[in-house]
Structure formats: C-alpha cells, structure tokens
C-alpha cells in the first residue's frame, strides 16, 4: 500500500515523541513491503530523499519565521502535496495545526488520526488557545476515518465526548536483555525494589500528585525515582516541595 505520514517535523528524529514514532514505524512499514512517504520540514537536518527505504518529502515550514503560526502553513503545504500523490492511507500524528484543513484532505485515502493528548487542557496555553485546541480536537474526531488513542483514558474520552470508536495503541519501547545493574547503585536502589516515573516536568503531568501519594503512604517505603529534564521552574518547585 502507498502510505503517507503527516504531522511531524520529519525523520530521522531530531525533535520529539511523534518524530520518534514516525521514524521507527515508517521503516517498519517499508520492511513489510509498503511504499511509505514521510513529510519533513524543508529545513530538517536530514536532507536526503530517502531514509532506509522511506521516501522523504520536504515541504516549506516557516515556523522559524512565524513561530507556531508557521506550523499551520507547513501542514497546509503537506496536505496540498498529498492531494497529488494518490495515497491509499494517510496517517496524521496529532491534530493541533492540521485539523483546520480537514476540508482539503484528499477523499480517496483512508484518514487515520492519532489523537495525542488533551492538548486544550495544558496550563501553558492561554484561554483563547485552549478554546482553539478544543475546536481542533472536535474537527479531528469528526473528520478522521479511524482514530488512534495512546491511552485508555483518551480512548474513553473520545467515546464519551464524541461517540467515536478508537483503537488503543500504547507507546512502544526498546527492550534490552542485559541491563547494567551497577547503575542502580548510583541511585541507592536495588533491582526489583523501586518504582519509577518518567515524564516531562510540566504541571499537567501531575508529578506532584504522584509524589504526594507516595509521601502519604507511610506503610510503603519502596523508593521512587523520577526521571526527566528537571532544570525547569516546575522541576525546582518539586525539588523544593519534596526535598525531605
């Protein structure tokens, strides 16, 4: 099948989670015999035409010039290019800046949308932006032929709010068979006797709620490791609040 992946800055991954997924999933699809195209920003560090068999389609991305607004133009450029290519499937990763162009999506391909998280609830966004993101979510939920939820909570939300079925597909991870257990000594924990939270240090990820629960459970003394980029305002807040 001829498959397109939209909604990321491109592959290989230099940016974040959706790019990481696009990199590995696109190559996997090629290995399964599909013809795969991934849209990249024109200024992506990788400027080759193919990546491990994946066709790379560079499109103009003025984010460097206009900030977030440039993402809407980039997504528009990707969609307009996709209209010319007779794809069988279009996989959109996220909906923030592409759902407003739903009426331009080519009609023939099956349109699959990974709905990401509840972006409109993120506290870092102003009220007008949150309202826009809520509308963007509604447009994506209504226009997608198939929806993908990366958590059971999102799947339940989509059904309750939009009466739309979705397929739950959790994020994957690399498995390794020979971990270096000596690393645990650096953190003063033992194999099989610790809990771990790995997340972005942002308020909406509720790390403080997790740690408050741990602090209140006086009977369970299992150590907990919190992993993430903690050199942030929220990270400083957590370290001060739970320093004991």
Where are these regions (language model features)?
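Membrane-proximal helix-turn-helix segments that form the acceptor-binding/catalytic region
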Residues: 80-83, 129-147, 156
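Nucleotide-activated donor-binding/catalytic signature segment of Leloir-type glycosyltransferases, i.e.
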Residues: 236-244
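Glycosyltransferase donor-sugar binding loop
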Residues: 44, 173, 198, 221-237
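Acidic anion/phosphate-binding donor-loop and adjacent secondary structure
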Residues: 124, 172-191, 236
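N-terminal strand-loop element at the rim of the active site
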Residues: 8-14, 27-66, 153-155, 159-161, ...
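An aromatic- and histidine-rich active-site surface loop
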Residues: 70-83, 87-116
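Helix-loop-beta element that forms the nucleotide-linked donor phosphate-binding surface
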Residues: 154-174, 187-190
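Conserved donor-binding/catalytic core segment of Leloir-type glycosyltransferases
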Residues: 4, 185-217, 225
């Amino acid at each position: 099948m001829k498959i397109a992946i939209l909604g990321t800055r491109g592959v290989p991954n230099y940016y974040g989670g959706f790019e990481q997924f696009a990199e590995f999933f696109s190559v996997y699809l090629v290995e399964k015999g599909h013809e795969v195209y991934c849209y990249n920003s024109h200024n992506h560090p990788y400027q080759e035409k193919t990546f491990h068999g994946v066709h790379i389609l560079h499109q103009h991305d003025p984010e460097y010039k206009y900030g977030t607004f440039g993402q809407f133009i980039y997504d528009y450029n990707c969609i307009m290019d996709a209209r010319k290519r007779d794809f069988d499937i279009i996989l959109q990763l996220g909906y923030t800046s592409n759902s407003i162009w739903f009426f331009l999506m080519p009609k023939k391909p099956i349109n699959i949308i990974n709905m990401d998280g509840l972006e409109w609830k993120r506290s870092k966004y102003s009220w007008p932006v949150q309202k826009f993101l809520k509308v963007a979510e509604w447009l994506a939920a209504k226009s997608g032929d198939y929806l993908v939820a990366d958590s059971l909570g999102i799947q339940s939300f989509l059904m309750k709010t939009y009466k739309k079925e979705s397929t739950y597909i959790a994020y994957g991870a690399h498995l390794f068979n020979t971990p270096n257990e000596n690393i645990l000594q650096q953190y003063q924990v033992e194999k099989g006797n610790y809990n771990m939270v790995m997340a972005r240090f942002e308020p909406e990820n509720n790390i403080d709620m997790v740690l408050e629960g741990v602090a209140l459970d006086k009977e369970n003394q299992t150590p907990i490791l919190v992993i993430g980029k903690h050199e942030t305002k929220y990270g400083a807040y957590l370290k001060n609040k739970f320093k004991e």
